[in-house]
């Protein structure tokens, strides 16, 4: 299954609610969301900076990955999020090799 990285920034209201009732949202919210689409949570970390939470998930496809983020966004607890598709080293090299085929046909606008 493909891997995705979610980066999530909470709203101030969400932080206030979490401070009143501290719990590991990685386990109580993220893991069940992944499992609901037939995937699994590989790992999750709280962080500081532009985002408050980073998750690595293994879900069946783009549709499943989008479903998780749509449901989370609809809940209103996020002020920003970012989803990144992750590739293995082998997949990255495979993509590099395929650029030769694309380069033969692609003509940039100039």
Show where each model-derived region lies.
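A compositional/biophysical signature of low hydrophobicity enriched in polar/charged and small residues
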Residues: 1-110
């Amino acid at each position: 299954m493909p891997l995705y990285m979610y980066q999530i920034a909470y709203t101030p209201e969400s932080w206030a609610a979490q401070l009143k009732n501290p719990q590991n949202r990685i386990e109580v919210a993220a893991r069940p969301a992944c499992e609901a689409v037939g995937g699994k949570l590989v790992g999750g970390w709280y962080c500081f900076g532009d985002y408050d939470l980073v998750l690595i998930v293994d879900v069946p496809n783009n549709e499943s990955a989008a479903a998780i983020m749509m449901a989370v966004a609809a809940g209103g607890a996020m002020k920003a999020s970012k989803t990144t598709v992750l590739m293995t080293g082998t997949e990255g090299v495979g993509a590099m090799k395929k650029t030769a085929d694309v380069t033969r046909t692609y003509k940039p606008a100039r």
